[in-house]
Swiss-Prot record:
<feature type="binding site">
    <location>
        <begin position="27"/>
        <end position="34"/>
    </location>
    <ligand>
        <name>GTP</name>
    </ligand>
</feature>
<dbReference type="GO" id="GO:0006886">
    <property type="term" value="P:intracellular protein transport"/>
</dbReference>
<dbReference type="GO" id="GO:0003924">
    <property type="term" value="F:GTPase activity"/>
</dbReference>
<feature type="binding site">
    <location>
        <begin position="129"/>
        <end position="132"/>
    </location>
    <ligand>
        <name>GTP</name>
    </ligand>
</feature>
<dbReference type="GO" id="GO:0005525">
    <property type="term" value="F:GTP binding"/>
</dbReference>
<keyword id="KW-0547">Nucleotide-binding</keyword>
<dbReference type="InterPro" id="IPR045872">
    <property type="entry name" value="Arf1-5-like"/>
</dbReference>
<dbReference type="InterPro" id="IPR006689">
    <property type="entry name" value="Small_GTPase_ARF/SAR"/>
</dbReference>
<keyword id="KW-0449">Lipoprotein</keyword>
<keyword id="KW-0333">Golgi apparatus</keyword>
<comment type="function">
    <text>GTP-binding protein involved in protein trafficking; may modulate vesicle budding and uncoating within the Golgi apparatus.</text>
</comment>
<protein>
    <recommendedName>
        <fullName>ADP-ribosylation factor</fullName>
    </recommendedName>
</protein>
<dbReference type="Pfam" id="PF00025">
    <property type="entry name" value="Arf"/>
</dbReference>
<feature type="lipid moiety-binding region" description="N-myristoyl glycine">
    <location>
        <position position="2"/>
    </location>
</feature>
<keyword id="KW-0813">Transport</keyword>
<dbReference type="GO" id="GO:0005737">
    <property type="term" value="C:cytoplasm"/>
</dbReference>
<keyword id="KW-0653">Protein transport</keyword>
Length: 185
């Protein structure tokens, strides 16, 4: 009986088991990437310092194991982003919605990255972060400023978020998980 259950369990896992998804989380420095990563992983706000290099964590949500690579966003290390492109299934691009002075810079970095051949099939989730701040641009304004509507050949979604409260983060993962299931047989 136990052996039958074990075989059934393996079959069940094969049919309905966890899917895995490799996510690259990038954005300009101080956008909130590391805060988002650890809010998703631990459910709490951690004290962060500027990321030199990367942080990587596994986040399980809705039967999907997301491996999230949080890569530093300072201008001097952005050229290193390309070393993380291979096998990336989804990009989370984090924007500081309150930083109107650098939204053009964010757009340029996003467009540069989306032109890379290795990322042509990657899903794009934009987190319009820091929505709790009074002068934050809303998701529609960020969509316009980043030129997202012109992305015809790519699945993309924008989600208003607040990393410190967690608002919007799991809604973004919902979209990623739905899109991943559409792509999977």
């Amino acid at each position: 009986m136990g052996n039958t259950l074990s075989i059934f369990g393996k079959l069940f896992d094969g049919l309905f088991g966890k899917k895995e998804m490799r996510i690259l989380m990038v954005g300009l420095d101080a956008a909130g990437k590391t805060t988002i990563l650890y809010k998703l992983k631990l459910g709490e706000v951690v004290t962060t310092i500027p990321t030199i290099g990367f942080n990587v964590e596994t986040v399980e949500y809705k039967n999907i194991q997301f491996t999230v690579w949080d890569v530093g966003g300072q201008d001097k290390i952005r050229p290193l982003w390309r070393h993380y492109f291979q096998n990336t299934q989804g990009i989370i691009f984090v924007v500081d919605s309150n930083d109107r002075d650098r939204v053009v810079e964010a757009r340029e970095e996003l467009q540069r990255m989306l032109n890379e051949d290795e990322l042509r099939d990657a899903l794009l989730l934009v987190f319009a972060n820091k929505q709790d701040l009074p002068n934050a641009m809303n998701a529609a304004e960020i969509t316009d400023k980043l030129g997202l509507s012109s992305l015809r050949q790519r699945s993309w979604y924008i989600q208003a978020t607040c990393a410190t409260t967690g608002d919007g983060l799991f809604e973004g993962l919902d979209w990623l998980s739905t899109e991943l299931k559409k792509k999977s047989p």
